[in-house]
């Protein structure tokens, strides 16, 4: 299962959870988080999630789409979605999460964050 924005993007990396900037507070369905945690232990995903065991490596969830850009050589990683997958990783005590990186421009980041983007984009 892939998102409409990153279906052809195979730029998947593992990032430390601490590297992700999550500017939007999540609204979580803990039943969904718990189901994802069970999937992470190797249990077959429920039919309602739209995934089959063939879609995933055992114990893995789909990667989280992450917008990234570099400023002064330092990469910044923004996760605007994937809140249930990220919480499942938190709850399971996993320090790393698979992410599908999507390069973005400063203007794209401003579309997502508005004036709040300035804290990341303004000069050092």
Swiss-Prot record:
Family matches, as CDD domains: Srx
Enzyme Commission number: 1.8.98.2
Domain of life, source organism: Eukaryota
Keyword terms, alphabetized: Antioxidant, ATP-binding, Cytoplasm, Disulfide bond, Nucleotide-binding, Nucleus, Oxidoreductase
GO CC entries: cytoplasm; cytosol; nucleus
Keyword Nucleotide-binding recorded: yes
Record's function text: Contributes to oxidative stress resistance by reducing cysteine-sulfinic acid formed under exposure to oxidants in a peroxiredoxin. May catalyze the reduction in a multi-step process by acting both as a specific phosphotransferase and a thioltransferase.
Subunit comment: Interacts with tpx1 in response to oxidative stress.
Homology family: Belongs to the sulfiredoxin family.
The protein's name in its UniProt record: Sulfiredoxin
Protein species of origin: Schizosaccharomyces pombe (strain 972 / ATCC 24843) (Fission yeast)
Gene name for this UniProt entry: srx1
